[in-house]
Amino acid sequence: IQTIGRAARSADVVLIDTAGRLHNKQNLMNELNKISRVVDRELPGCDRETLLVLDATTGQNGLIQAKQFKEAAGITGIVLTKLDGSAKGGIVIAIAQELQVPVKFIGVGEGIDDLMPFEAEKFVEALV
């Protein structure tokens, strides 16, 4: 919360990593919602990107998770990780379609160069 206040005074970019939030842990989701409200209050009108990072091995539970994260924080995009293994991440199609939230990036490894822009055609080819 203090980071957001400081950013309002002197930063061009703020990254807030809320790793470990589980949609079934209400206190953590409430905290996420609070962070979102503070950003709205302290940085009104800012260009804001709120990304939900989803593991490609996530099944149908991913849709429930995405719905609750969208409600709590207004997600604007999805990052689909762990596509370097046998996981295909097909649930992301249902999430993107139902919630009207685009997939922005994919992760295919653990290095910084392994985060790549999402390319729908390549993703669909890999699914079939």
Mark where each language-model region is.
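P-loop/Walker A NTP-binding module and the surrounding RecA-like catalytic core of P-loop NTPases
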Residues: 1-128
